[in-house]
């Protein structure tokens, strides 16, 4: 996937209502716009990645214990600790994490949906 197609999918998601809870003292609308801006600022050049479900994700979220192929669309944290992944087959977003060493495996939180902001905020 190229950057333009990823941006189209992300922006379509951000244009829909979100299930993201307001965890601030701000009015909900302002909080959501602030969080959308943070996500947009964290977008990266799309890259193909592989991720693995954590034990919790297989037991509680029904993910199969296998390697999954995704497109990484956003990253934050030290050396890309937290990631927003996109499944191009379904346009669902997943949150993932990995250690600070680039060679470490990427693990899926487990939840996924077409709500980019909700998944990004984990």
Model regions and ranges:
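N-terminal domain-onset segments
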Residues: 1-61
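Intrinsically disordered, low-complexity segments enriched in small/polar residues
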Residues: 17, 60, 75-78, 97, ...
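Amphipathic, interaction-prone secondary-structure segments
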Residues: 40-91
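Acidic, proline/glycine-rich low-complexity IDRs
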Residues: 62, 85-122
């Amino acid at each position: 996937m190229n950057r333009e197609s990823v941006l189209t999918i992300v922006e379509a998601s951000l244009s829909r209502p979100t299930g993201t809870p307001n965890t601030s003292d701000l009015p909900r609308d302002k909080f959501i716009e602030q969080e959308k801006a943070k996500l947009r600022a964290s977008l990266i050049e799309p890259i193909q990645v592989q991720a693995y479900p954590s034990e919790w994700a297989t037991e509680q979220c029904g993910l199969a214990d296998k390697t999954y192929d995704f497109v990484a669309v956003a990253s934050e944290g030290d050396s890309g600790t937290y990631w927003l992944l996109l499944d191009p087959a379904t346009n669902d977003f997943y949150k993932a994490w990995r250690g600070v060493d680039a060679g470490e495996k990427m693990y899926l939180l487990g939840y996924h949906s077409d709500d980019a902001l909700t998944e990004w905020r984990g």
